[in-house]
Every structure is written in C-alpha cells, then in structure tokens.
Amino acid sequence: VITLGGDGTLLRAARILNYREIPILGLSYGHLGFLTAASPEERDILQVVSDALSGELHVSRRATIAADIVSVREDGTKDVVRSFALNDMALTRGPLSDMVEFDITVSGHHIDRLRGDGVVVSTATGSTGYALSAGGPIVSPDYTGMVCVPIAPHTIQARAFLTSPSDVVEIFMSDDRPSVPAIAIDGQFITCDGTVESVAVRRGPGDVLLLDYGPESFYNSVSRVFYGVRHDR
C-alpha cells in the first residue's frame, strides 16, 4: 500500500487495513512526514516506488496497542469498545471538564492518582507525536513496550514512564471527582455509549509494517524533524 500525504494519511491507511501486516510505503506530501519513507525533496519518488517493488527497502515492524474502553450506561449496564492504534491512546478532559482525576495502574500495580488534563499511552512509534509534546521521551521504533505520559499534571512529581511489552496499563476514572473525559485513538475521537469508567491498554495482537531505507532512517528523521538537520542521501 502506498500513501501520499503526511503521517495522518499513513495512520488512516493503517486503520483502513485494520492493522494487518501489509507493508505500507509512505511518501511525504504533507505537513509532517516522520513515519514516511521519503519526500520529493529528498529522493526521486519513482525510484522509491521502484525500490519498494523490487524488495530493496527495509521492513520496519511497528508494535500497536489495543485499548478496551469501558463505559456505564444510564441503566447501569456496561459497554466495552475495543480500538487499536499505531500511535497512541489519549484520555483528556472533555469540553465540559476543567480537569480529570484518575488512578493509573500497570499490571495490577497502583502507580498514582493523578489530576490534570489527562494521559497519553503510546507505542514507540507514537512517542514522537502527542506523547512527545506532553513531555515524553523519543523511543526507538523497535521498542515494543508502551510509553505513559501524564498531560499537564497538577503535581511536579508525576513523570512519564515506560512499560514492558507484556504489561497492561489501566486507567480508572475517580468517583471523587466525576468528569466526562474525551478519548482519542490515533487522533480520532471515540464515541462511547455511556460515561467512561476505565480504559485498559495493552500491546496489540498484530504489528504494522512500514517500508523505509533502514534503521538509520529513524535517527535521520529525528535530527531532521526535531533539530532541523538536513541529510544528504
């Protein structure tokens, strides 16, 4: 599959493919092309496509995450929505909330009760997106755990942290401070049939395959996008 656009276009393609392991070649014609293999300014696009068809490009296997969102209907029954992401799951304060309060646990171990604008749980791929803007680290794409980053927490003690690939991150909304959070998966807001009670995030069942020119492409992209360094190809 070939995408023409930015990272958002590539994320939509992964979603349309339902995160099946079909190689995706991203060609950057958008605002940000961090996940794409090349742009017209860097390489001859026809040559890039030719390299892909001849099997000369590197296949980068990217871990995904699965989020189970539990909501409670007005009649007390519960609804569960499962969604997958290549980048991240973001739980944020909704338009009618001044902040959200929640408990966060990792594989049953309580980490903290936080108040603030929310939390981002991302893959290594998503570490250069919303998670980075919230203060998280840039993580090599071959890392298969998750990155958890509080968003504008009302404490200086809250810190971003990494999990192992087998961990499950659970977020429980506080009963002491009821709020209506917004939940976005790869930037797409999820509609729930009730009030959100909890979200459980774990590694997804499959990976997304991105085509690029090798592992060094990631670090070249980091220096180009975030530090403004140009690389001669």
PLM features per residue range, with description:
Residues I104, G126, I183:
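Short aromatic-centered micro-motifs
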Residues G8-A14, T128-S133:
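Short glycine/serine/threonine-rich phosphate/pyrophosphate-binding segments
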Residues R12-G30, F34:
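Gly/Ser-rich helix-loop-strand patches that form or flank binding pockets
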Residues V72, S83, L91, S107-H110, ...:
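ATP/nucleoside-binding phosphotransfer catalytic cores, i.e., glycine-rich phosphate-binding loops
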Residues H109-Q157:
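Gly/Ser/Thr-rich active-site loops/lids in small-molecule metabolic enzymes
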Residues H31-D117:
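Catalytic core of DAGKc-family lipid kinases
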